[in-house]
C-alpha cells in the first residue's frame, strides 16, 4: 500500500529542481513558475508549469520542446525513474 501512495520527495531533490526552475524562469523571462515534485517507490513525478507573458523569450512549440529536453537532461543524474510533465500557459488558472 505504501508504494501506491505519493510522498514528498527528498528535500535535497526538491531544492535542486526548484533552483533549476527558478534559473530557467529568469533566463526565459517567465512571469512565474509552479513546481510539484512527489515520489512513489522508485518513481519521481515532476510537474512544472511556466506562466509566460509577452516578454517571455519562448513562443514556438519547438523552443518549448528544446527547453523540456534541457530540463530532462539537467535531471539525468537523479537516480529515480522520472516522469516529467512541463506545461506552458499564459493563464495561471491552468497551472493551479
Predicted segment positions?
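Alpha-helical transmembrane segments and adjacent TM-loop junctions that form the membrane-embedded core
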Residues: 1-96
Amino acid at each position: 500500500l505504501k508504494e501506491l501512495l505519493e510522498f514528498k520527495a527528498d528535500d535535497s531533490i526538491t531544492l535542486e529542481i526548484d533552483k533549476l526552475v527558478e534559473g530557467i524562469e529568469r533566463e526565459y523571462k517567465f512571469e512565474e513558475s509552479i513546481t510539484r515534485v512527489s515520489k512513489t517507490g522508485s518513481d519521481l513525478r515532476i510537474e512544472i508549469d511556466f506562466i509566460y507573458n509577452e516578454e517571455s523569450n519562448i513562443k514556438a512549440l519547438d523552443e518549448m520542446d528544446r527547453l523540456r529536453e534541457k530540463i530532462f537532461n539537467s535531471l539525468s543524474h537523479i537516480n529515480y525513474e522520472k516522469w516529467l510533465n512541463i506545461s506552458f500557459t499564459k493563464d495561471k488558472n491552468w497551472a493551479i
